[in-house]
């Protein structure tokens, strides 16, 4: 009988704790210096008896001087659909999008309610809230905005150390991975930059001179794969990634053959630095025609551009400043019976014997 009573007590305690426990998650993604809002911590509270979240206490580690933080904000994200009541979700939507042109730098206003904002002067700070809780799941999150001169090598860790609701401390459960160190980053390309809808499929190399060269798809009209209006873009940095030069286009085919640019897409690039002489190579798939249908099913057996995708390259002998005209490798490498032949995107390597390898 004693065991049964003890089991019932434990079970009731578990349910009480689960109902009014603040669950916390810290995503392990870079903090982008140019963003006004970066998700620092996500919180979920399923309120059955709790009426108001009074405040939360945030602790920052000592790895970063506080004057390099421009703002800490507490947002309320509302609730979720009832079918997710028992799912451990931490947000109903992406509060800061990476895909909508012109909206990648700050929280989307219609998705959030700003509850408090401050510039930290101590490593332990209280964010006031006084948010009335929805009877069910409630979402909160902490945003961080950095000063523009924060070093790229800086790191940061943060934790929710206390949450007060209805005048009492809530139980806390942190679901984050252990010992997370958040690193700084720069968004080299954002949706909407230069009037482009999306940038995808990145590759990055360091030249013998220490220059960073990043390649990617420039997807002008949408994020859709080939066939579409897509060029291969390149960004260049000579200061370790702090600043980036204007975008270049190592591979672009325009209205080749009299067809529209959206039927001359080139993409899925890979980049390589020949370590023996610092020559830089970019390779990609060029698709001609195909009527804006997906290249995966529209590229057919054959060798000429009117029937099958072409494997093309461009090279730079001046550390990525300028690029050659396209070099077509299709006739040297493709078999006529193959449907679609191209390399995997990303980066290649230089072997010890000087052989250049794209996988």
Annotate each predicted stretch with a short phrase.
Residues 37, 79, 113, 134-141, ...:
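Asp-box/BNR beta-propeller blade signature and adjacent active/binding-site loops
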Residues 19-182:
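Exposed, polar/acidic Ser/Thr-rich sequence context and nearby capping/turn residues
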Residues 4-5, 75, 105, 202, ...:
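Residue-level detector of intrinsically disordered/flexible regions characterized by low predicted structural confidence
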Residues 1-20:
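Bacterial Sec-dependent N-terminal signal peptides
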């Amino acid at each position: 009988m004693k065991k049964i009573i003890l089991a019932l007590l434990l079970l009731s305690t578990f349910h009480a704790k689960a109902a009014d426990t603040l669950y916390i998650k810290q995503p392990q993604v870079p903090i982008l210096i140019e963003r006004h809002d970066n998700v620092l911590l996500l919180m979920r509270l399923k309120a059955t008896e709790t009426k108001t979240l009074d405040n939360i206490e945030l602790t920052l580690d000592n790895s970063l001087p506080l004057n390099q933080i421009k703002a800490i904000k507490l947002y309320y994200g509302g609730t979720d659909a009832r079918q997710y009541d028992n799912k451990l979700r931490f947000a109903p939507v992406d509060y800061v999008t990476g895909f909508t042109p012109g909206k990648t730098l700050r929280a989307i206003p219609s998705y959030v309610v700003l509850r408090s904002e401050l510039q930290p002067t101590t490593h332990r700070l209280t964010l006031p809230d006084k948010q009335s809780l929805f009877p069910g799941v409630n979402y909160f999150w902490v945003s961080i905005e950095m000063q523009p001169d924060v070093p790229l090598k800086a790191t940061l860790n943060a934790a929710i150390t206390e949450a007060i609701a209805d005048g009492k401390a809530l139980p806390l459960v942190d679901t984050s991975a252990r010992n997370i160190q958040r690193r700084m980053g720069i968004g080299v390309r954002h949706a909407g930059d230069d009037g482009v809808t999306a940038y995808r499929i990145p590759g990055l190399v360091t030249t013998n001179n220490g220059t960073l060269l990043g390649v990617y798809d420039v997807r002008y009209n949408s994020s859709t794969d080939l066939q579409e209006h897509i060029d291969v873009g390149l960004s260049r940095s000579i200061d370790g990634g702090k600043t980036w030069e204007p975008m270049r286009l190592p591979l672009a085919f325009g209205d080749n053959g009299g067809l529209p640019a959206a039927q001359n897409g080139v993409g899925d690039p890979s980049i390589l630095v020949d370590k023996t002489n610092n020559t830089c190579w970019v390779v990609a798939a060029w698709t001609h025609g195909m009527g804006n249908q997906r290249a995966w099913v529209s590229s057919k057996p054959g060798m000429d551009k009117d029937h099958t995708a072409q494997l093309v390259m461009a090279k730079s002998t001046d550390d990525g400043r300028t690029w050659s005209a396209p070099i077509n490798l299709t006739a040297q490498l493709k078999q006529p019976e193959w449907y679609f032949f191209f390399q995997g995107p990303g980066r290649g390597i230089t072997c010890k014997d000087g052989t250049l390898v794209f996988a």
